[in-house]
């Protein structure tokens, strides 16, 4: 088990910091020299270092080999800098590629940035250092046009092969009305269908061996065990999986592009739909990141309300996960039982927020309104109901000998492989790594709650992953019990000029507040020019928002890092040599939805 150090800072999280005192800055200076890079002050809460393109692979390798290494490539993506006006003190750049690394031993992050000119968008691939960079580099090339030299398959990943242009560039249209009317001719249809034809040679696969042909089988994109619009092309030798290629993007909606056209306030409903089972959990990292930009400190009551709603949705998501997992293995009854339990959660959520799946209820600086009368009774009823139901799921289904035979030891991997592929959440903790953001990087007051983090015994397989989720639900019940018994008094919104919308009561008395209310609701609040970042422990792993403000009513760049994206990229490395039936159990054990993958 890895010991972690909780991050500490004497400065408020919204103040710009360059983190010059972070030990990694001194280590980089000692190794590469003081002039090898520059440090950017931000409100991200982590060191942000600009590195020369020629040095990026050396720096990445150095960080991964430190005594307390930065072992995980958490994120990699790009920014179109051409229209950004507030760039004082930053290296000249038309485009930027950033690398976000995590050190588990240090419980610290670092972000590396590489400046690129529009005339030369080449930089070397880092897939030999971090294998999970594969998909991130493909998406960055697709969305911005940066070419990662040495990448073995730099092709489109979210968009159809026939798509033209790079959608996240600033000169690319953001609305359908800015395009010509779409007409699907027979010729275009044939072209699209041809683009979906799998050609093994493009992926370095052989069509056969020893005078025998392999079978190539499409699992999905419309298969019940694919859990959404998701295709996996299987290379089969009988029932054995020789290799496979996950094919994603069918659910891509351009969530990050939408963030550039919505105000800071009006983007909140879009966050619910990134991982559509998570509800308020999705809103948490976004509003916290915006509040860092604004310098808002919310009241204690807001923190506890947000935690309460997040844990309700965590249980709701986990219930659907374990019931559909059991269904994938062959047990039907738990699905119907779980929907009864989830209905009780929705009763509580609807009474509090007015909505069920997608509340869009968190606000910049607070929540939409205060808790209603009688919420305590609804929550009390649910807390009394669920523990016995969890016991029955474990006793009747999860300890079933058939299920255990199908799941134990299947699709198993250890801590090193999990970190190499960017795995987070219960799948990572099943390998024995005790890393839960709620504990080690507390947000929204989680440090004030008493709960345990379930951790596995060193191997993450199809059985340990689901059993950890059951224990996580029990811990969420503990947190909810504390919310019920210790709900603070006080306002449900912060008293801050950028709280959106401002407290309604004052608009009836002060003309300045009325004007502010009108402007913030119609145009949106103006956030200070800066960058902020917030990660949380979401239902399926670590989710985060990396926001860039250019001093406007809208985000200049909204980067959404979701846990399901790297989890699906890992599939081939885990399932090679297994049977097709094992793949079905493995897919059920991952816990993903395609909106979380494709955004």
Curated annotation (Swiss-Prot):
GO MF terms held by the record: NAD binding; NADH dehydrogenase (ubiquinone) activity; NADH:ubiquinone reductase (non-electrogenic) activity; quinone binding
Region annotation (NADH dehydrogenase I subunit D) ranges: 213-599
Top-rank EC class of the record's enzyme: translocase
Region called NADH dehydrogenase I subunit C, residue ranges: 1-189
Enzyme Commission number, as recorded: 7.1.1.-
InterPro entries xref list: NADH_DH_suC (IPR010218), NADH_DH_suCD (IPR023062), NADH_Q_OxRdtase_suD (IPR001135), NADH_quin_OxRdtase_su_C/D-like (IPR037232), NADH_UbQ_OxRdtase_30kDa_su (IPR001268), NADH_UbQ_OxRdtase_49kDa_CS (IPR014029), NDH1_su_D/H (IPR022885), NiFe-Hase_large (IPR029014)
A Pfam entry, by short name: Complex1_30kDa
Gene3D superfamilies found in the cross-reference section: Cytochrome-c3 Hydrogenase, chain B (1.10.645.10), NADH:ubiquinone oxidoreductase, 30kDa subunit (3.30.460.80)
An example Gene Ontology CC term for this record: NADH dehydrogenase complex
Domain of life: Bacteria
Reactions this protein catalyses: a quinone + NADH + 5 H(+)(in) = a quinol + NAD(+) + 4 H(+)(out)
Subcellular location: Cell inner membrane
PROSITE patterns: COMPLEX1_49K
Topological type in the membrane: Peripheral membrane protein
UniProt entry keywords in alphabetical sequence: Cell inner membrane, Cell membrane, Membrane, Multifunctional enzyme, NAD, Quinone, Translocase, Transport, Ubiquinone
Role this protein plays: NDH-1 shuttles electrons from NADH, via FMN and iron-sulfur (Fe-S) centers, to quinones in the respiratory chain. The immediate electron acceptor for the enzyme in this species is believed to be ubiquinone. Couples the redox reaction to proton translocation (for every two electrons transferred, four hydrogen ions are translocated across the cytoplasmic membrane), and thus conserves the redox energy in a proton gradient.
Protein family (similarity comment): In the N-terminal section; belongs to the complex I 30 kDa subunit family.
Subunit structure of this chain's protein: NDH-1 is composed of 13 different subunits. Subunits NuoB, CD, E, F, and G constitute the peripheral sector of the complex.
Designated name of the protein: NADH-quinone oxidoreductase subunit C/D
Organism the protein comes from: Sodalis glossinidius (strain morsitans)
Lineage: Bacteria, Pseudomonadati, Pseudomonadota, Gammaproteobacteria, Enterobacterales
């Amino acid at each position: 088990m890895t010991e972690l150090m909780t991050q500490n800072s004497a400065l408020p999280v919204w103040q710009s910091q360059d983190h010059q005192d972070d030990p990694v800055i001194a280590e980089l200076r000692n190794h590469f020299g003081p002039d090898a890079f520059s440090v950017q002050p931000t409100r991200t809460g982590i060191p942000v270092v600009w590195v020369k393109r020629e040095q990026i692979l050396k720096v990445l390798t150095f960080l991964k080999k430190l005594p307390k290494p930065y072992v995980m490539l958490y994120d990699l993506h790009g920014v179109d800098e051409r229209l950004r006006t507030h760039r004082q003190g930053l290296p000249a750049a038309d485009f930027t590629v950033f690398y976000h690394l995590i050190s588990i031993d240090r419980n610290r992050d670092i972000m590396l940035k590489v400046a690129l000119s529009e005339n030369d968008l080449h930089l070397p691939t880092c897939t030999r250092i971090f294998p999970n960079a594969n998909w991130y580099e493909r998406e960055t090339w697709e969305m911005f046009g940066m070419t990662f030299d040495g990448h073995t398959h730099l092709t489109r990943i979210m968009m159809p092969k026939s798509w033209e242009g790079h959608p996240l560039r600033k000169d690319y249209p953001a609305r359908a009305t800015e395009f010509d009317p779409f007409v699907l001719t027979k010729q275009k249809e044939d072209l699209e269908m041809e683009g979906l034809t799998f050609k093994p040679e493009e992926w370095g696969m052989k069509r056969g061996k020893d005078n025998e042909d392999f079978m190539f089988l499409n699992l999905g994109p419309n298969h019940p065990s694919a859990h959404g619009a998701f295709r996996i092309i299987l290379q089969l030798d009988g029932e054995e999986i020789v290799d496979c290629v996950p094919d994603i993007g069918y659910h891509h909606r351009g969530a990050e592009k939408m963030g550039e056209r919505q105000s800071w306030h009006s983007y909140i409903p879009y966050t619910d739909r990134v991982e559509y089972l998570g509800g308020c959990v999705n809103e948490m990292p976004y509003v916290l990141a915006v509040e860092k930009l604004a310098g808002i400190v919310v009241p204690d009551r807001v923190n506890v309300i947000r935690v309460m709603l997040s844990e309700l949705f965590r249980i709701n998501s986990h219930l659907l996960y374990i019931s559909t997992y059991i269904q994938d293995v062959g047990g039907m009854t738990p699905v119907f039982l779980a929907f009864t339990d989830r209905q009780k959660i929705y009763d509580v959520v609807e009474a509090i927020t007015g909505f069920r799946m997608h509340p869009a209820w968190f606000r910049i600086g607070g929540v939409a309104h205060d808790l209603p009368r009688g919420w305590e009774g609804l929550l009390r009823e649910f807390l009394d109901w669920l523990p016995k139901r969890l016991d029955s799921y474990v006793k009747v289904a999860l300890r079933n000998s058939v299920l255990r035979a199908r799941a134990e030891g299947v699709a198993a991997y250890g801590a090193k492989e999990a970190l190499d592929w960017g795995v987070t959440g219960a799948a990572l903790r099943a390998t024995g790594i005790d890393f839960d953001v709620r504990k080690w990087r507390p947000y929204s007051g989680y440090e004030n709650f008493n709960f345990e983090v379930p951790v596995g015994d060193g191997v993450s397989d199809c059985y340990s992953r689901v059993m950890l989720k059951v224990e996580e639900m029990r811990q969420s019940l503990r947190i909810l019990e504390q919310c019920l018994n210790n709900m603070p008094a006080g306002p449900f919104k912060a008293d801050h000029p950028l709280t959106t919308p401002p407290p309604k009561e004052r608009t009836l008395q002060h003309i300045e507040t009325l004007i502010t209310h009108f402007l913030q609701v119609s145009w949106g609040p103006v956030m200070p020019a800066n960058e902020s970042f917030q990660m949380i422990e979401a239902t399926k792993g670590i989710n985060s928002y990396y926001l860039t403000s250019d001093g406007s009513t809208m985000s200049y760049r909204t980067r959404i890092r979701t846990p399901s994206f790297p989890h699906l990229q890992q599939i081939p490395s885990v399932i090679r040599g297994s049977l097709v039936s094992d793949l079905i159990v493995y897919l059920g054990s991952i816990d993903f939805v395609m909106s979380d993958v494709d955004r």
